[in-house]
């Protein structure tokens, strides 16, 4: 039950009804109409911009149009008052008797309250993490992993058919570097001698067990062999070991994927899908043979002064056309990425979302152009960029990890502060803003720690329900049964404010899904928790506001219904974020 969507329909009907006296009203674009909470709760329950966005098309003053719309809205059931404010904003106050019905709908739906058909079952591919298989995941990967996972969950809750995908970059030069690094650890294990890891290779201790396993399997077989003999073998083994490590890291963070897609598969089994994709683009005129001009200012990636295959990315708004084939005949990363997204299209995805690190921001425009070109405009690519994470402890930057060699691993952070703290805090700031993650602060049990504050609200709700059951054994346990409680007994301003806050959950879900902004869920849950804790604290000072009233069963039932509603929305929202809705704080 989306109150805002329901009344948006009423507003559109009111505008359409004006067609009798204003013929132009029948041809208006009503999609611009928004119904939202007023900025000041004292102004009512709902506000709409209808007159402000439609007046120009009707050649009317916004306030004059607002008066006409308001007169129609005043006749809508459950509307107690309609006010026109300022230049033409319309504020609606609903009957007090309307809100118990909203709470009852919430209680009947439980944690499914807010589930939407916004997506209409549209297939969406969400690709995230896609860390190179060259080592353990670090704290920088963590943000994109949590963001992508929460976004996928949010989209699924909003009615999209979501596929979660991880792209394994196992065909580039970095996996050869991995193989050479593993070989040195193999020599170390096979000979018992300490090997110095030169610059340009991976120095982390995480490759030590890989080398030991290789030594156990191959003994001294490859100690004197040329690289050409051992490189493919060591590369395959090391990639497998790294992906197993990455999967374990992801599992610790509560993340799983539907698809792991290998870059190497694009040119495997005798079929060069990268080359085929380039030829397809050549036939449509999107790829041509030409020379790039010398770079101006910052160097252009992959620039070489030679005749080469170029993608016409400038035709799609990019700064320069982009190379697809290197001078040694191998493909650029860009060429492989085009073929990969073509594969997504061939698998039926017309909507793709990629989650990248902010350092890939310059890659967005060309990749979107390529997707448009390779799918003949039938598919869209949206890219969400995640900014850097600064890892702190009591305000001081955390030193690098010995295990990783040059960074702090995701696993170290999760092991220290827990999955829930990591996930919630990674989402408690918009993804395009730099995040300071303080290991000391995220485990504080205080109001200043958002994850504790929200989880504690759910635990407090469950504690109230347990206490009520202990005092009155005949009370129902199911929240759905409380939908039949005398909810009109909820008359306190704080109670009604909390009901109205909960009523905003379906709208919040659709807004966050449409904007691809799961941080909105975290912010909203914090607001719900704040209001719930506030109402509980009022009951400490004013006994008549407590949730359990000894001599008034009906009022107790109504307030316990509200507690069930709070718990359901908190559990639903935390579930979307991948955070546990705990019943007790430890």
Curated annotation (Swiss-Prot):
Q: Which CDD domains match?
A: ArgRS_core
Catalytic activity from the UniProt record: tRNA(Arg) + L-arginine + ATP = L-arginyl-tRNA(Arg) + AMP + diphosphate
List where in the cell it is found.
Answer: Cytoplasm
**Which biological process terms from the Gene Ontology are attached to this UniProt entry?**
arginyl-tRNA aminoacylation
UniProt xrefs under InterPro entries? aa-tRNA-synth_I_CS, Arg-tRNA-ligase, Arg-tRNA-synth_N, Arg-tRNA-synth_N_sf, ArgRS_core, DALR_anticod-bd, Rossmann-like_a/b/a_fold, tRNAsynth_Ia_anticodon-bd
On whether Ligase is a keyword of this UniProt record, the answer is yes
GO molecular function terms attached to this record: arginine-tRNA ligase activity; ATP binding
What positions does the record give for the motif labelled 'HIGH' region?
131-141
Protein name as catalogued: Arginine--tRNA ligase
Species: Azorhizobium caulinodans (strain ATCC 43989 / DSM 5975 / JCM 20966 / LMG 6465 / NBRC 14845 / NCIMB 13405 / ORS 571)
Q: What is the lineage of its organism?
A: Bacteria, Pseudomonadati, Pseudomonadota, Alphaproteobacteria, Hyphomicrobiales
């Amino acid at each position: 039950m989306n109150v805002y969507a329901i009344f948006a329909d009423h507003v559109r009907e009111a505008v359409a009804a004006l067609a009798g006296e204003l013929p132009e009203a029948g041809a208006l674009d009503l999609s611009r109409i928004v119904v939202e909470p007023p900025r000041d709760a004292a102004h009512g329950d709902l506000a709409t911009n209808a007159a402000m966005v439609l007046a120009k098309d009707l050649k009317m003053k916004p306030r004059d149009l607002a008066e006409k719309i308001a007169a129609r809205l005043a006749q809508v059931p459950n509307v107690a008052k309609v006010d026109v404010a300022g230049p033409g904003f319309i504020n609606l106050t609903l009957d007090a008797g309307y809100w118990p019905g909203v709470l009852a709908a919430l209680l009947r739906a439980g944690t499914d309250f807010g589930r939407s058909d916004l997506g209409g079952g549209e297939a969406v591919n969400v690709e995230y993490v896609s860390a190179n298989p060259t080592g353990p995941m670090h704290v920088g990967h963590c943000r994109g992993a949590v963001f992508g996972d929460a976004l996928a969950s949010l989209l699924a809750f909003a009615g999209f058919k979501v596929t979660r995908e991880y792209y394994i970059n196992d065909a580039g030069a970095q996996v050869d570097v991995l193989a050479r690094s593993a070989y040195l650890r193999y020599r170390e294990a096979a000979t018992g001698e300490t090997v110095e890891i030169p610059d340009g290779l991976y120095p982390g201790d995480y490759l030590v067990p890989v080398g030991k396993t290789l030594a156990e399997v191959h003994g001294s077989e490859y100690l004197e062999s040329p690289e050409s003999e051992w490189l493919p073998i060591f590369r395959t083994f090391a990639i497998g070991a790294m992906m197993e490590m990455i999967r374990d890291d992801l599992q610790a963070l509560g993340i799983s994927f539907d698809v792991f897609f290998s870059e190497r598969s694009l040119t495997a089994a005798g079929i060069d899908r990268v080359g085929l994709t380039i030829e397809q683009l050549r036939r449509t005129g999107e790829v041509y043979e030409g020379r790039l001009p010398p770079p101006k200012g910052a160097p252009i990636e992959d620039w070489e002064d030679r005749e080469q295959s170029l993608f016409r990315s400038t035709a799609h708004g990019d700064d320069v056309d982009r190379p697809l084939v290197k001078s040694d005949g191998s493909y650029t990363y860009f060429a492989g990425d085009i073929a990969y997204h073509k594969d997504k299209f061939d698998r039926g995805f017309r909507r793709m979302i990629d989650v990248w690190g902010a350092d890939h921001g310059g890659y967005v425009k060309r990749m979107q152009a390529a997707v448009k070109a390779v799918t003949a405009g039938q598919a869209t690519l949206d890219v969400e960029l995640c900014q850097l994470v600064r890892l702190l402890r009591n305000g001081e930057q955390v030193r690098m990890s010995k295990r990783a060699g040059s960074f702090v691993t995701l696993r170290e952070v999760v092991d220290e502060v827990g999955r829930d703290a990591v996930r919630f805090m990674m989402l408690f700031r918009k993804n395009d803003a730099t995040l300071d993650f303080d290991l000391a602060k995220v485990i504080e049990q205080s109001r200043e720690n958002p994850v504790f504050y929200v989880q504690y609200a759910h635990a407090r709700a469950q504690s109230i329900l347990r206490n009520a059951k202990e005092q009155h054994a005949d009370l129902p346990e199911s929240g759905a049964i409380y939908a039949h409680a005398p909810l009109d007994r909820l008359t306190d301003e704080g109670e009604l404010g909390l009901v109205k806050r909960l009523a905003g959950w379906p709208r919040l879900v659709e807004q966050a899904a449409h904007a691809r902004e799961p941080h909105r869920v975290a912010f909203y849950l914090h607001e719900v928790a704040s209001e719930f804790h506030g109402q509980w604290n009022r009951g400490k000072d004013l006994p008549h506001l407590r949730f359990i009233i000894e001599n008034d069963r009906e009022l107790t039932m109504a307030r316990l219904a509200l507690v069930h509603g709070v718990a359901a929305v908190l559990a639903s929202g935390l579930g979307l974020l991948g955070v546990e809705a705990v019943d007790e704080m430890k």
